[in-house]
From Swiss-Prot:
The gene is MRX12. It comes from Saccharomyces cerevisiae (strain ATCC 204508 / S288c). Keywords: Mitochondrion, Transit peptide. Residues 1-35 form a transit peptide. Associates with the mitochondrial ribosome. One of its GO terms (cellular component) is mitochondrion. This is MIOREX complex component 12. It is found in: Mitochondrion.
Amino acid sequence: MLRSLHSAATLSNKRFYSLISHSNRKNIIKKLLRHPSFDPIRHHLPEDITTIDPYSLSQNVIESLNKLEVPKKDAAMVHNMMIENLSDLDYGVATIHSNNLRDLDLKPSLPAIKQIIRNNPGRVQSSWELFTQYKASMENVPDELMEVVLEKIIKFDKAEKVDGKKSLTYQDLVRCLYLINHFSSNYNLPSELVEPILIYIVDNGIPNVLGSVLKYKIPLSFFDKYVSEMTQYQICELYDFYSLDNIVADPLVLHKCLTVLGENEKIQQTEEEKEIISKLEEEIDIVKSQCHDNWSLEFPNWSVRKTATSFEELFLEIQKRNIDKKDFELAHKLLRLIGAFKGKVSLFFKLYDEYLLKFKNNEDDLMFEAFLTLCCQGYKSSNEKMLQYAEAFIKEDFDSKLESKIQSVLIVANAKANIDLSLKIYNSNISTAKREKDKYTDLAESDVLTESLILAFLSRDDADFARVIFDGALGEKLISGPTAAKKIKNLLAQYGEALETKTSKQVMQTKIEHYMESI
């Protein structure tokens, strides 16, 4: 039996949906009623039918269908047409006519289902819940329906907005990934539906899922705005997905990939990333249950990624295209990575000679890199001769900023072999070190020199003298402010923690290496 008008009226009293203002509502209704499916009832509708609101129109249509005992198939066409054309004016129309279809033991048409989900306010059932209900009766879910559902997840149901929802959740992400993984291989998904998912992934440092979304032809340039925020793990995913041609053609991504692959021998998931994966797996199980599907997300089969091969591949591509000869920042970065980080001294000096000829205005920066490479590798290998060779690259007319860096490096580089020399260098330079703070680091040259000396003595397990240095610097007002003081206190605290595990010397020596690599 068709649902009675009494039931429809009761439903009307319960509905939470407001009538949407629509300037051409009358024209929409006129056009709708001219459709052949309304032929059996058209002459039984009131003459002013085009002027009434959609909900009242539904009441009149249902009354006519009941009175005229219109055949089931023809009535279904009318119900579907009402849903397809009027749901965006008043969602109550979709509710009434979908219930009538259910009473006829029929399902809404695909266009009707799309309108039901598209306009669902989400207070009674979420759009995802509606989707899973309709999906259960479908052998194959059409791409166009999944696109509507994806859009509702990304843009939120109206009820979610009213309740203050501002961003996606892990639950939303997994539902999006489910839909994305079920689109036909050749389906052209609009970028405006893909990009918000990528932004959420980047903003929340989510590993393992970029590849599933990137298959929808997102240009690498999309990440230019976000590459600085991406985790090391995500950068590796990006590098693995795009071709070398794409990577080297995008300067921002190229620099970031080079940095991540060059500074780290391996990239491994952090504890936070492992926790995120665990939460995603929980949501995947829920979606599988809701959708009665054995779907699983194919995560990359590595949790630890060695970088040597990828770095070598990228370096050779840069060399082949002479990109480093046109970009000093890139050339400078390569010298730091190959020299200080990787210790390939012969290759470093080959590049150094090439860059001296190519970038004649940047001689000071290049000479500093040569000095730093020899200091860094001399310290790592306990090679005093390297430290002596390093001083050959110190010019008398270096600017004060480079000069300050040089003294700081010499203080820590000599910590293993000659700590007295480290102290001598500090005492010779601290009185002339600038006290003005750098606007980016909030540290003065005197802060950096003092921190270097304290680190040098901590690497020798001489915490007592390190504290004497700190107290003396505070007393002599060599510490410029709270930023520097806090930084040194943190260093002393890290030493204390390492001392408890009997790894203090190793930890502080590693800190010296990182200090020189990143200065």
